[in-house]
């Protein structure tokens, strides 16, 4: 459902897009030439001559990682998304021994999004 997915990435996660409908949406990123695209699964499978199968549950084969400047930004984003009523498959933010602080949220189709930072300060 492109409407639901675009609303999630635009309105909840704050990614910019000029999408006005249709089967394809491009989002701007702060990192310059890197692009983030959504493409209707129902249209995408046609390129492979496959049958469309709606997703169920958490997609365990794909993750999108969004990195923030500091641990404090990670905690603030977690609190903001919590206030919006989102759920977190792995729970609250955690800091690992190897220096990453992160948490996970799932988009409306079950794709995991890791939100984290490697910068304590």
Region spans (language model):
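A short, acidic/glycine-rich surface segment
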Residues: 44-51, 91
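Vicinal oxygen chelate
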Residues: 27-30, 49-121
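N-terminal beta-strand motif that seeds the catalytic metal site of vicinal oxygen chelate
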Residues: 1-6, 63-66, 118-121
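Residue-level marker for the onset of beta-strands and adjacent loop->beta junctions
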Residues: 13-14, 23-25, 62, 89, ...
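Core segments of cupin and vicinal oxygen chelate
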Residues: 1-45
């Amino acid at each position: 459902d492109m409407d639901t997915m675009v609303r999630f990435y635009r309105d909840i996660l704050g990614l910019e897009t000029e999408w006005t409908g249709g089967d394809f949406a491009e989002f701007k990123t702060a990192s310059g030439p890197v692009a983030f695209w959504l493409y209707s699964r129902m249209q995408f499978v046609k390129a492979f001559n496959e049958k469309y199968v709606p997703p169920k549950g958490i997609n365990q084969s794909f993750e999108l990682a969004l990195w923030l400047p500091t641990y404090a930004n990670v905690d603030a984003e977690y609190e903001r998304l919590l206030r919006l009523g989102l759920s977190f498959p792995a729970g609250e933010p955690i800091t690992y021994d190897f220096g990453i602080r992160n948490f996970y949220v799932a988009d409306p189709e079950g794709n995991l999004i890791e939100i984290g930072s490697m910068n304590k300060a």
